[in-house]
A protein has these predicted regions:
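Fe(II)/2-oxoglutarate oxygenase catalytic core
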Residues: 1-151
Length: 151
């Protein structure tokens, strides 16, 4: 396990086909702030939806059972400003590992993202990919982030 600038990179077993997946820890205080935001903003919560081409977002509990709050990339309220700073640190470390991606376009968070709570037995129960429903836009996406806040 190596460390860089306060970030901890968790080394995974060596694999024969590079999958470009890396993991880092986001500081506990930032994660706690996101959880607190979710808990304190009940009016923003909604049932999780599945995005289907031609239908948009539909609630299908057999496919996905969650409670979500959608966060706009322009939401610079606490704790999301600190979270984005940490994501940028992770991206900077990722670029050091895979420098060829820095030759491509600049990276930024352009899609809304979700804070999702899955009840016991809930979750995404079918195969899916992470996308925002604008199917053609995501064809060229080359980096996805997920932050798990469970203990």
């Amino acid at each position: 396990m190596g460390t860089n600038r306060g970030l901890t990179l968790h080394q995974r077993p060596i694999i024969t086909n590079e999958d470009f997946i890396q993991t880092w820890h986001i500081p506990e205080g930032i994660c706690d702030g996101i959880l607190e935001y979710f808990e304190n903003n009940e009016k923003l919560r909604m049932n999780g939806v599945c995005i289907e081409e031609g239908k948009g977002g539909v609630i299908e509990k057999d496919a996905k059972e969650s409670t979500d709050i959608s966060i706009s990339p322009s939401n610079m309220n606490q704790p999301f400003m600190d979270y984005r700073i940490e994501l940028q640190k992770c991206l900077n470390e990722y670029i050091k590992i895979y420098p060829h991606i820095n030759l491509m376009n600049k990276f930024d968070i352009v899609e809304s993202y979700n804070i999702q709570h899955y009840p016991v037995g809930g979750g995404f129960k079918v195969e899916h990919c992470e996308r925002d429903g604008t199917f053609s836009k995501n064809i060229k996406r080359c980096l996805v982030f997920m932050t798990y806040l469970n203990d």
